[in-house]
Amino acid sequence: MILTIILYTLLFSTCSAQSVHTMPEAVSRLNWGVMFNRGPTIMNGITKYRHTFEVKVPQLVYTPIVHMKCDTDYLKVLHCEAINDLIDSINGQVEPLITELKTRIATWMNPIPNVDTLTLPETQGRRGRRRREATLGPDYCKKINDPNYEGGGGGFLSSVGNFFSSLMGSPTWDDIKIIDKHICQLADVVDLNKEKIVQLGTEFATFSKAANNRMDALEDGMKNINTRVTETNLLLEKLSTEVTGALTQLENEIKMSMAGTNLLFRVQKQLYKFQEQINTMSATVEDFGNGINVLLSGRLAPQLVSVDSVKYVIDIISEKLTQQGGETRLVDQNPALYYLLNNVVFTKSEKLNSLYIMVSFPIYSIGGLMATYRLDKTYISIKEDVVSSTQIADLPDFLAVTPDGLYYSEFSTSEISSCTGDVIKSCKNERALQSFTQMTCAAALYKDDSTKILELCDIRYDQITVPSTAIKITDDTYMIHSSKVGTGHQWTISCPLIPNYVSTTMDACNACVVQVSCGCELIAPGEFYIPLQLTGCSKVLSSYIPHIEPKFPVNLPVLYAYFDDSVLNEINGDKLLNYKWKLDIPSIAPLEEEWSQSVERSQKYSSSLKKLLEETKANRKVYASKATAMLKKATDFTDLKLSKIKTLSDTFKDLSWLTKFGTGGGIAGVTIGLLLPILAIVFSCYVFCKRRV
């Protein structure tokens, strides 16, 4: 996890001006009732350049250090017994450790499918299917290098497909054929090193050996120290022979004792260095195991393939693409990106003692890394103190946008969930991108194009009470709906982290945006509670006084019904007002044949704002009461249906008179409306009785 954070930080720190990492975390279109909140980054690369790395599995070869001879008095004077005790101590520690490390490597490698042996189906008449073993060898490699080879029964990497189908989705048969060829060619290459790239017949596939220099150096160091200890033993024997008979007995023993002490120190130094090498090897093997665990999760591991190796392949690919010309390019030149993608195919060969990792480097002309935004819808009230509100219906769950802002694509939650990866997601089913010149409703909202929004979006008009709630739109900012506005209800602002701060109150507001300061909380009794905020605490809490001032979005769908574009040019989808916006707007009631249905919270009760305004325009009246509607029913005998319109902008023409609708006019309408139904009922009874006569 820590390594992933480091790689992501490296990727972010090296991003260019037009990079997915510099795109905003949130895009506010609250005046339309939508908030775009940043989701995961996805990769959209249609073509893939495949490269296979061969990684050698560590081989821990340890030969126990042999004892020096200690069968004469002269050798004993040279401290041979003390030296042998040191050798026994080292061997006693190292041999069990090497055995344990070998067991751990085998355990780590066990889940990885082995390409050396597998079973292929073979039909034997009525006896049913029998199975035979196929092994990696010249015959198979000759077959697989045939350009007409299509795999037939599955190829020796069918086990890879079976393994990944349960873990992260099957690799394509094209992937398997390419890595088959890579393994066969690597088996024939003797002197290949990590700097040498071998290209297959295909233009977009290469392979190389990624040597584990660290492990190779440790193995060489262990062999070297073992050799030096053996040389010391021989030196002791030679020394004892040379000094014998050359001096008197006493002088001989003193000379040998001094030489033996010196040699003992030399042996101790080499053995301690040997023990340090063993400890380093143990840590290196642990890194290899961590790399295998990362690989099993579907990602490339830097413990197995170094950043320099990936960078070298990136340079090769970039050079090829430059030579070809055109607009095709790699998704990203930064090696850190490819350690974050879940797109590797891997297998092992026990015969070759190697691990094979095929990495796909996505290539694109448009798209590449794209930022996704989750579309969060909210109600925007017609007025603060009324239940009528608007909301945009039928929006996608996510909108993916390219860093240059020229292309987009829409995703559902299930489609995003099916993509693999943590920081950067790779989707199995990639799609073509749409240009922002051909917009959908979601794209128009992202671009804040009011003309296209009014044309393409299904804006719904609802007469339901929005329950009290606080919706978090950024770290410390909330969109608030209150059902108790206008009742004198108040909220409490408490700041327990600020010394000597006395709790204050604020009036309840509806469809407002509130930023809660660091160290404070907002308590709305009986409605909601915004807990203590710890975001943005860069200031010294004792040196400032928090202030919470609500801001108010405006209902742009309604405003466009009463004003032309020239009046609204300065009001964008993200502009919030510091005051409550006021406009005398008439009540717009959805008309149904059965009035009892109009109180049900159903799809019928949620009406299209376009249709309602069209009906209002066609009839040139606003129904102020149920009695007025009954009068029309009695005198017209036609069903009242909301007619369709082409665009909302057509509906908004010639409606400026609605702004003059006042309280007096509404009362007059109600008074006349109470008289006319009575006359209509009397008239209906008269007609009915006359027909019976």
UniProtKB/Swiss-Prot annotation:
Residues 1-17 form the signal peptide. Residues 688-693 are cytoplasmic. Keywords: Coiled coil, Host membrane, Membrane, Signal, Transmembrane, Transmembrane helix. The chain crosses the membrane at residues 667-687. It is a single-pass type I membrane protein. Residues 208-256 form a coiled coil. One of its GO terms (cellular component) is host cell membrane. Residues 18-666 are extracellular. It is found in: Host membrane. Its main location: host cell. It comes from the Viruses. This is Putative transmembrane protein ORF68.
